[in-house]
Amino acid sequence: MFMSSIIELVTAAITPAIQTPYELVDVEYGKMGGDYVLSIFVDKEGGISLQDTADLSEKISPILDTIKPDPFPDQYMLEVTSPGLERPLKTADAVEKAVGKYIHVKLYQAIDKIKVFEGTLLSFDGTDLIMEYMDKTRKKEVTIPYQTVAKARLAVKL
């Protein structure tokens, strides 16, 4: 089974179990070293604690055992974790919540010969992101069509 199919099955199975105050941020499955790892990234307002991840792991693990036929080709480790400071912005809803925050955006196609922008997300209307970024020593604004975004994540401003 393809990795993307496994991720879709797992996401569909566990989403109902991850309820408020928690938010499912992402699901990843792949090899880390010699082992397969299923990573479930969750968050909540104010941040996620070690106890939260332990509780969610106990809730999610039995659900994964009910997926038939078993989508996992090999044994795997389950990791329930925080998305971290540089959490991915994989949906339009996640981008909307990031308005006012410092973000990193990679594009499929360059705008003014630039494919990577890092700056403050000023607004997002579902179609375009408007960002303020530094070009050497000058502040500039750029309008980025959402469909040209390859990857976006929160960023730490140094």
UniProtKB/Swiss-Prot annotation:
- Where is the major localization of this protein? cytoplasm
The protein's matches in CDD domains, at most eight in alphabetical order, are given as:
YlxS_C
Q: Which UniProt keyword terms apply here?
A: Cytoplasm, Ribosome biogenesis
Q: Which domain of life is it from?
A: Bacteria
Q: What is any one GO biological process for this UniProt entry?
A: ribosomal small subunit assembly
Where does this protein reside within or beyond the cell? Answer: Cytoplasm
- Extract one GO cellular component term from the record: cytosol
Q: What does this protein do?
A: Required for maturation of 30S ribosomal subunits.
Q: Which family does it belong to?
A: Belongs to the RimP family.
Q: What is this protein called?
A: Ribosome maturation factor RimP
